[in-house]
Amino acid sequence: MAEERNFRKVRRGYVVSDKMDKTITVELEQRSTHPLYGKVVRSTSKVKAHDEHNDAHIGDLVSIMETRPLSKTKRWRLESIIERAK
């Protein structure tokens, strides 16, 4: 009997670095509302993602998906390029 994979996280973010071979750095932005004052607070985090064919470049809006650990810091892979940088 084949087991189904668990739900994998999918995130959207902008590529901020593509200097490495087959690796991109993606900046993810989370927005949350302050519980008391109601101000929208932005927080960002950077993750490294696997880009097999070196398709993505700086400024591209990409979709990344969680995957098994590929190296010491890589746990995401490029799913698709949503919008190219102008």
Swiss-Prot record:
Q: What is this protein called?
A: Small ribosomal subunit protein uS17
Q: Which UniProt keywords apply?
A: Ribonucleoprotein, Ribosomal protein, RNA-binding, rRNA-binding
Q: Which Pfam families match?
A: Ribosomal_S17
GO (cellular component) term, any one: cytosolic small ribosomal subunit
General function of this protein: One of the primary rRNA binding proteins, it binds specifically to the 5'-end of 16S ribosomal RNA.
GO molecular-function terms, A-Z: rRNA binding; structural constituent of ribosome
Among the record's GO biological process terms, what is one? translation
For this protein, the record's PANTHER family field holds: 40S RIBOSOMAL PROTEIN S11 FAMILY MEMBER, SMALL RIBOSOMAL SUBUNIT PROTEIN US17M
Question: Which family is it part of?
Answer: Belongs to the universal ribosomal protein uS17 family.
Assembly and oligomerization:
Part of the 30S ribosomal subunit.
User: Which HAMAP family does the record match to this protein?
Assistant: Ribosomal_uS17_B (MF_01345_B)
